[in-house]
From Swiss-Prot:
It comes from the Bacteria. InterPro entries: 2-IPM_HCS-like, 2-isopropylmalate_synth_dimer, AIPM/Hcit_synth_CS, Aldolase_TIM, LeuA/HCS_post-cat, LeuA_allosteric_dom_sf, LeuA_bact_synth, PYR_CT. GO terms for biological process: L-leucine biosynthetic process. HAMAP family: LeuA_type1. Residues 5-267 form the Pyruvate carboxyltransferase domain. Coiled coil: none annotated. Catalyzes the condensation of the acetyl group of acetyl-CoA with 3-methyl-2-oxobutanoate (2-ketoisovalerate) to form 3-carboxy-3-hydroxy-4-methylpentanoate (2-isopropylmalate). Keywords: Amino-acid biosynthesis, Branched-chain amino acid biosynthesis, Cytoplasm, Leucine biosynthesis, Manganese, Metal-binding, Transferase. Pfam families: HCS_D2, HMGL-like, LeuA_dimer. Its main location: cytoplasm. This is 2-isopropylmalate synthase.
C-alpha cells in the first residue's frame, strides 16, 4: 500500500536566506497563502530569534494559516526556543524545529565542543521544547559528513528525549544519492526505536544532487522531504519541491509513495515565489521552466501531434499550466477580466478587482489587446502597491537626445506636499535616480537593476526590478509599464515607499518599547 511522504516547505526560512532583499510581512503572507493552496503539510516560516522582523512575520503567518502546520526554527538554546514558541503560540497547530551540528568539523571548529557535550545539549533542548508542544523536530546539522556511529547514537538519544521528527540534512550538498540512501538505511538498521519518529531529509544542491539524494532517501525509508519552491536557498539552493512532488506522482509505480499536495497549484506557487523573491526561473528548469513542455525538434513535434505520451511523461495541465488564449480589450467588462483571472488560477482574494480593472483599462487603451501574461503581470504589480503611499509620482520629463548627459525633472508627492527637482546623469535612469534621491532625502545605493519583458513583441510590458541598500539593509522595488523609463521610475518610487514603511515600523517599535518600560 502506498505511504504518504510529508512535504515540508522551507521557502520562507531557508529559501529567504538567498535573497538580496528581505521580504516584508505582506510578501511573506502572499507566499504562505500560495503554499497553503498548494497543500504543503508543513511550512517553516522563519527564525524568530534572528530579528524583530522575523518574529513579526512568523507571528502573523501563524495567525493566518489554518490548513498547514506552521513551524519555526530555533537553536538548542532556551531563549531561542522561548521566542519561537511565543511567535507560534497563536497558530492552530505548530512545530518547533531545533538543530545542532553533529559533524566533527562543525562541532570542533564552530562550537568548540566535544560530541558528549552535543548529546547533553540535544537532550536538554528537546525536553525543554516539549514544554510548548509535543511536535518537535530535531536536525543533525551536516549529517552528510557525520560519522555514522555518532549519527546513529544522537538520533536514538533524540528520539528517546521526545523528538517526533528526526531530520538528516546534507547541509553542504556533499553526498551522492547512493551514499545518502545508505545513511538512511543505516539509521533504520541500527537505531532500535527508529519507528517512533518520522525520518526527514533536507538536501542542498551544491553538486546538483539535492533531488536525487531526496529520492534515494525516500527509497530507503524517509517519509518527510524538506525543500523550497523553485529550489531557492543558500548557495546553490535546496531540493526543489515541485520536482520532488512530480517525481513522486509520475513514478509512484516505482516509489510506492504519494503526497497530499494539489499538483495543479504548482505553477501558480512557482510564479508567486519567483516574482516576490525576484529570482527568475530558468527556461530549462524542470517542471516549471518555460521550455519544460516545449517541443521544437521535428520528430518530437510529429510524435506529440500523434500522441502526447510519445514525448510527455506529464501534462502541463497537471501542474496548473493552462493554454489560455485571452482576447481582452478596453471594451471588456469586469466579468471577463475576473473570468480570465480565475482561469489562470487566481482566487478573488489574490487581488483587488477595482484596482486591477483600472490598470487593465489603462493598458488596454495603450496596447489594444491584453493577453494572459499582461494580466498576470498587472495583478502581481498591483498587489505590491500599498493602499497609502507616502511617495507618489505626479509627473516626470527626461531629455537625453542632445548630448551624452541626460537630464530629468521629477515632480513627486511626499505626503501632503509636492516637490520638484531636476538632475543630470549618465543616461535617463541615472538622472531620474539622482532626482528621486534628492527629493526623498534618502541616502541609498543602487545594488541591482534588472529589466525583463513580460510578453512578446514591441508592445510587451517591461518589468523593472531594483535592489537598493539603505542603512545596512537591502530593499526591493518593482515597476511595470510599456515604457521602460516609466517602469524604472515606478520601481524607484516603490522602493522609496518600502524604505519609508520600514522606518515607520522601527519608530512604532521604539514607541511601544518605551511605553512598556
Amino acid at each position: 500500500m502506498s505511504q504518504q511522504v510529508i512535504i515540508f516547505d522551507t521557502t520562507l526560512r531557508d529559501g529567504e536566506q538567498a535573497l538580496q532583499a528581505s521580504l516584508n510581512v505582506k510578501e511573506k503572507l502572499q507566499i504562505a497563502f500560495a503554499l497553503e493552496r498548494l497543500g504543503v503539510d508543513i511550512m517553516e516560516v522563519g527564525f524568530p530569534i534572528s530579528s524583530p522582523g522575523d518574529f513579526e512575520s512568523v507571528h502573523t503567518i501563524a495567525q493566518k494559516i489554518k490548513n498547514s502546520l506552521v513551524c519555526a526554527l530555533a537553536r538548542c538554546i532556551d531563549n531561542d526556543i522561548d521566542v519561537a514558541a511565543e511567535a507560534l503560540k497563536v497558530a492552530k497547530n505548530f512545530r518547533i524545529h531545533i538543530f545542532l551540528p553533529t559533524s566533527n568539523v562543525h562541532i570542533q571548529s564552530k562550537l568548540k565542543k566535544n560530541f558528549d557535550q552535543i548529546i547533553d545539549m540535544t537532550v536538554h533542548a528537546i525536553r525543554y521544547a516539549r514544554k510548548y508542544t509535543d511536535d518537535i523536530e530535531f536536525s543533525c546539522e551536516d549529517a552528510g559528513r557525520t560519522n555514522i556511529d555518532n549519527l546513529c547514537r544522537i538520533v536514538e538519544i533524540a528520539i528517546q528525549s521526545g523528538a517526533s521528527t528526526i531530520n538528516i540534512p546534507d547541509t553542504v550538498g556533499y553526498t551522492t544519492p547512493y551514499q545518502f540512501g545508505q545513511i538512511i538505511t543505516s539509521l533504520y538498521n541500527r537505531v532500535p526505536i527508529i519507528d517512533k519518529a518520522i525520518i526527514s531529509v533536507h538536501c542542498h544542491d551544491d553538486l546538483g544532487m539535492a533531488v536525487g539524494n531526496s529520492i534515494s532517501a525516500i527509497q530507503a525509508g524517509a517519509r518527510q522531504i524538506e525543500g523550497t519552491i523553485n529550489g531557492i536557498g543558500e548557495r546553490a539552493g535546496n531540493t526543489a519541491l515541485e520536482e520532488i512532488i512530480m517525481a513522486i506522482k509520475v513514478r509512484e509505480d516505482l516509489l510506492n509513495v504519494h503526497t497530499n499536495v494539489r499538483c495543479q497549484e504548482i505553477y501558480r506557487a512557482s510564479q508567486v515565489v519567483s516574482q516576490l523573491c525576484n529570482i527568475p526561473i530558468p527556461a530549462n528548469k524542470a517542471i516549471v521552466g518555460s521550455n519544460a513542455f516545449s517541443h521544437s525538434a521535428g520528430i518530437h513535434q510529429d510524435g506529440i501531434l500523434k500522441n502526447r505520451k510519445n514525448y510527455e511523461i506529464m501534462t502541463p495541465e497537471t501542474i496548473g499550466l493552462k493554454d489560455v488564449k485571452l482576447n481582452l480589450t478596453s471594451r471588456s467588462g469586469r466579468a471577463a477580466v475576473k473570468h480570465h483571472m480565475k482561469t489562470m488560477g487566481y482566487q478573488e482574494s489574490d487581488y483587488d478587482m477595482d484596482k486591477l480593472y483600472d490598470v487593465f483599462l489603462e493598458l488596454a487603451d495603450k496596447k489594444g489587446q491584453v493577453f494572459d501574461y499582461d494580466l498576470e503581470a498587472l495583478a502581481f504589480i498591483n498587489n505590491q502597491q500599498e493602499q497609502s503611499e507616502f511617495f507618489r509620482l505626479k509627473c516626470f520629463h527626461v531629455d537625453s537626445s542632445s548630448s551624452e548627459v541626460a537630464h530629468a525633472s521629477v515632480k513627486l508627492y511626499c505626503g501632503n506636499n509636492t516637490y520638484t527637482h531636476s538632475s543630470s546623469g549618465n543616461g535617463p535612469i541615472d538622472a531620474i535616480y539622482e532626482a528621486l534621491t534628492h527629493i526623498s532625502k534618502l541616502s541609498i545605493n543602487l545594488e541591482r537593476y534588472q529589466l525583463n519583458a513580460k510578453g512578446h513583441g514591441r508592445n510587451a510590458l517591461g518589468q523593472v526590478d531594483i535592489v537598493v541598500s539603505y542603512e545596512g539593509r537591502n530593499f526591493h522595488g518593482v515597476g511595470l509599464d510599456t515604457d521602460v523609463i516609466k517602469s524604472s521610475v515606478k520601481a524607484m518610487i516603490h522602493v522609496l515607499n518600502n524604505i519609508w514603511r520600514a522606518k515607520q515600523v522601527i519608530i512604532q517599535r521604539k514607541y511601544i518599547k518605551k511605553n512598556n518600560n
